[in-house]
């Protein structure tokens, strides 16, 4: 077993993926981790998206440490922007998605209309901005100052995907039997926000892919493998916490594998761990292929390696402990 990928929330009897061959640690981290955490705390004072001081402290800590590992070579201001984007998504999901959204999906749908309005380029939503709307406007303004029009369009498209993913998850949370395993695997990258993080990489690190490179098979396969890996290891790491909080974790990879294969929890974890290891190997192979040639493709491969490594690292953080 790989200690880097094991979390204390998972009972020792349950298998966890061994990712040492594909993503060996230790993982490099930016020297700005503490600065990111301090900035994140201040940003959440300016835009009070989280009411609980304990939750705020936990989220700013994992964000500071996680973003420092996601883009370890990025500049300080770029790291702040990436952290704030992750804070917004996570705080919105905690406040309006999951169990809250499942209790009233129609209200969640009405809430998201303000953000769709802003993402479409309208500066003032009808009725004025909420605190989440004001925070999103701040993020979009700052990102727009750094990004090309194409990069900005990609980010806003992924943010819309995230909003849809949160709504999708809330809609199905109390009726997971309606969700097939292929449906879940297709949606999970959007609910774990990893494709949005990947979409920021070019701006964070100062490179730009051509459209032919972006649509090439090696890049698409690498991004898919990293997106899958992020969601799946998150599901394994958070399983015990979700079970302790809600009594079950029925809309997640282990539960869906148990239903699909009519197996017990240990076998589901074993199957999920193998899935993680296989996708990690795919990602590592594509990273090696793309870094060999240099240029923006190599920059992108290095960025994806750091993104994947950050998910491998952060699943052991206290945010996932019961």
UniProtKB/Swiss-Prot annotation:
Pfam families assigned: Terpene_syn_C_2 (PF19086)
Names of the cofactor(s): Mg(2+)
Record-listed Mg(2+) 1 binding positions: 93, 98
Bias type Polar residues, positions: 1-11
Residues given in the record as Mg(2+) 2 binding sites: 98
Residues reported to bind substrate: 188, 241, 319-320
Enzyme class: lyase
Residue span of region Disordered: 1-26
GO molecular function ontology, one term from the record: terpene synthase activity
Renumbered ranges of motif DDXXXE motif: 93-98
Reaction it catalyzes: (+)-copalyl diphosphate = (12E)-labda-8(17),12,14-triene + diphosphate
Residue positions of motif NXXXSXXXE motif: 234-242
EC number: 4.2.3.193
SUPFAM superfamilies: Terpenoid synthases
Cofactor: how and how many bound: Binds 3 Mg(2+) ions per subunit.
Binding positions (Mg(2+) 3): 234, 238, 242
Keyword line: Lyase, Magnesium, Metal-binding
Entry remark concerning the domains of this protein: The Asp-Asp-Xaa-Xaa-Xaa-Glu (DDXXXE) and Asn-Xaa-Xaa-Xaa-Ser-Xaa-Xaa-Xaa-Glu (NSE) motifs are important for the catalytic activity, presumably through binding to Mg(2+).
Entry's family note: Belongs to the terpene synthase family.
Role of this protein: Involved in the biosynthesis of the labdane-type bicyclic diterpene labda-8(17),12(E),14-triene. Catalyzes the conversion of (+)-copalyl diphosphate to yield labda-8(17),12(E),14-triene.
Protein's UniProt name: (12E)-labda-8(17),12,14-triene synthase
């Amino acid at each position: 077993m790989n200690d880097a990928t094991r979390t204390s929330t998972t009972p020792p009897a349950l298998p966890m993926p061994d990712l040492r061959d594909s993503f060996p640690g230790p993982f490099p981290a930016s020297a700005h981790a503490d600065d990111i955490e301090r900035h994140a705390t201040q940003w959440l004072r300016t835009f009070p998206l989280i009411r609980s001081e304990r939750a705020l402290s936990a989220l700013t800590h994992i964000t500071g440490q996680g973003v420092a590992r996601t883009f370890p070579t990025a500049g300080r201001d770029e790291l702040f922007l990436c952290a704030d984007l992750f804070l917004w998504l996570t705080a919105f999901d905690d406040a309006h998605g999951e169990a809250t959204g499942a209790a009233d999906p129609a209200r969640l749908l009405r809430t998201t209309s303000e953000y769709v309005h802003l993402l479409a380029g309208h500066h003032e939503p009808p009725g004025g901005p909420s605190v989440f709307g004001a925070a999103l406007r701040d993020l979009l303004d700052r990102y727009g100052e750094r990004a090309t029009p194409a990069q900005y369009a990609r980010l806003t498209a992924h943010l819309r995907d995230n909003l849809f993913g949160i709504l999708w998850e809330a809609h199905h949370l109390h009726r997971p039997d309606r969700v097939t395993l292929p449906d879940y695997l297709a949606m999970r990258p959007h609910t774990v926000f990893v494709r949005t993080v990947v979409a920021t990489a070019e701006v964070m690190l100062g490179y730009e892919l051509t459209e032919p490179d972006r649509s090439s098979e090696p890049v698409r396969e690498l991004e898919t493998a990293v997106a899958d890996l992020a969601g799946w290891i998150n599901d394994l790491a958070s399983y015990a916490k979700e079970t302790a909080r809600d009594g079950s974790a029925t809309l997640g990879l282990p539960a869906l594998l148990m239903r699909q294969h009519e197996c017990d929890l240990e076998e589901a974890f074993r199957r999920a761990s193998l899935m993680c290891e296989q996708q990690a190997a795919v990602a590592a192979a594509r990273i090696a292929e793309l870094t060999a040639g240099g240029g923006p493709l190599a920059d992108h491969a290095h960025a994806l390696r750091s993104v994947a490594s950050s998910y491998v690292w952060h699943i052991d953080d206290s945010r996932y402990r019961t």
